[in-house]
Amino acid sequence: EIELFILALSTIDLSEELCSGKIYLVDIEEERVDIQLLILFDMKDMFEYLSLYEMFVNNVYYKKFYEDVWHKADELCEKNIKVVIRNLNSSLCIGFECYSHLLQNIPSMLESIPFQRILSERKNKFENAIVVSAGPSLAKQLPLLKAYQDKAVIFCADGALSMLEKEGIIPDYVTNLDFTDLAMKFFQNKENKTSLNMLSCATHPSLVHFLDNKSVVLRDDPLYQRFNLNDFGYIDTGTHVSHFSYTLALALGFKNIIMIGQDLAFDEEGNSHSKGFDFGEKFSGEENIDKLKVTAYAGKGEVLTHITWNDYRIKLEYLFACNEQKAKFYNATEGGARINFTEELSFKECCEKLLTKEKPQFELPKSLTKNRSDKLLVK
């Protein structure tokens, strides 16, 4: 009860402990409690000790009369801890593989377009962005996207690239962070020479070597900052490609970020991806993951998703909640799962309301000189 907190804090001075983070007060009935716990557990000094988590109830009274409440609190904590650490592989294989890719990619990265140069030339030059994902709802949005492509900067997840190309839509940025080489299929036989390919430093080396017009970007992680290659960093790439698109749009200073194709759920026919997806509308990689039902777009019933997509959704909500002062996020998917901390608006309404000006045209930023690149490689 809030009254008990007030009574306790009026008799004991805990101001120093509260300010220093030794004590956190969390209201488990608050609407944003999941976001608050994610922020808490994602802090470095907290993250390191998550494996030691245990709920202690130090009063028999609460065990006797409030067992359901502390069980609920315990379940909330465990659920959000799992979201924070779900992507850790117990064998560390993924972590080692990503680090191996980074080391292999450093020569290519030094020859690519520095991320900081992109920011210096393009940041805060336009307000409206569209992030395109490859969910089942994308196909119905493509005609309108084509009509408005000159009035919004388009960030395209690699899996949606083929669908856009077939409609004659040229994205400004294409994002990729796959540590496997499956994504090579998304880029083969493409005519596009003007999009900027934004790649994570852990992207599979085969794809990094294959692509032109690329920027290989370091993650905002202390491990990568130790290389002192500051021209090529730093950004939160997240754990799925659309997350990378959103953080890139935020880094470039966009104020209105519209999302389409961001279903994060199966459609009524059981499709995982949009028509035209390179691996098929029913991608086999999604079939064997544990399923659950979540609230649908616009609150209209429920849709079927799986735990990986659900993790992505929660992490996006965390990202949007943390950046709601910097940008307005519009969910114009018109399908899939509801994503909190976004305004649900039809794509047509978004276009008519926001996309009234032509976007600026940019030359591709230049890479470092060979001399500068060689010096950095020697370091």
Mark where each language-model region is:
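Hydrophobic, small-residue-rich alpha-helical packing segments that form membrane-like cores
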Residues: I113, R117, Q141-P143, F155, ...
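Glycine-rich phosphate/pyrophosphate-binding loops
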Residues: A160-L161, G168-D178, A249-H273
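Active-site/ligand-binding-proximal alpha/beta "capping" segment
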Residues: P205-L264
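N-terminal donor/sugar-recognition subdomains of glycan-related enzymes
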Residues: E1-V131, P136-V153, M163-K166, L182-F186, ...
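Short secondary-structure boundary/capping segments
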Residues: I12, I170-Y173, K214-S215, F266, ...
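A structural signal for short, well-ordered beta-strand segments and their strand-loop junctions
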Residues: C156, M198, I257-G261, E268, ...
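Conserved phosphate- and dinucleotide-binding cores of soluble alpha/beta proteins
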Residues: F5, L248, I258-G285, D290-A296
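Short, basic, glycine/proline-bearing loop/turn elements
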Residues: F126-V131, P171-D172, L223-Y234, K293-L304
